[in-house]
Amino acid sequence: MTEESNVNESNEASEVQEDHGSLVAARREKKRQIEERGIDPWGSRFDDRILIGDIRSRLDEVKFQKEDGTLIDLPELHEDPEQRINMRQWRSDNGPGTEIGPQVRAAGRIMLQRDKGKLRFIDIQDWSGKIQLFVGQKQVGESDFELAGLFDLGDLIGVDGRLGVTNTGELTIFAEKLHFLTKSIEPPPAKHVGMTDPELRQRRRYVDLAYNDGVLDRFMNRSK
């Protein structure tokens, strides 16, 4: 190995360490702001939640109710975005009406966030599955929407809301109330890198289970 490559690796390691430090500092600042709102950032009870896998199995309870009260089953939904139906067009074709669905309570780890101004889309996951949350400023109120701005990937949150389907055909919980459960100070591994070091994966098994695709499924299958 040349001296130049040694220098390059040293510089890269220094940059990674600096980036990690700034990410941790930002998360600690958000934790402080959460505490200022009177919320315990290290753990809160959240009783009567439903497993995400069980919530997803209740898709058949989501209906389109026409103005005359007639209930129409929704079309088949697909996990593949390329195969999803344009639900906006489907609803328009079926005439004036409203989508109805069961009230659900879920909790999970934040795996993905998308900020759309006065809307946020958040993917949460527990050991049984993953689901999208629709968080609208109008629907959850100013206080909860501001709280959502303090969320980070890896945080544990709870939600109360209505199960439904977005215009793009994705099964979603339309949030009415958010609950902050636990702050994750340590940022997750980069999605394109993950955790590949065997020793590190053993030492930080909780991270391996949470973020590496397929690890939790294999663990659950072996435990049966």
Residue ranges and their predicted role:
Residues 1-224:
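Class II aminoacyl-tRNA synthetase catalytic cores and aaRS-like
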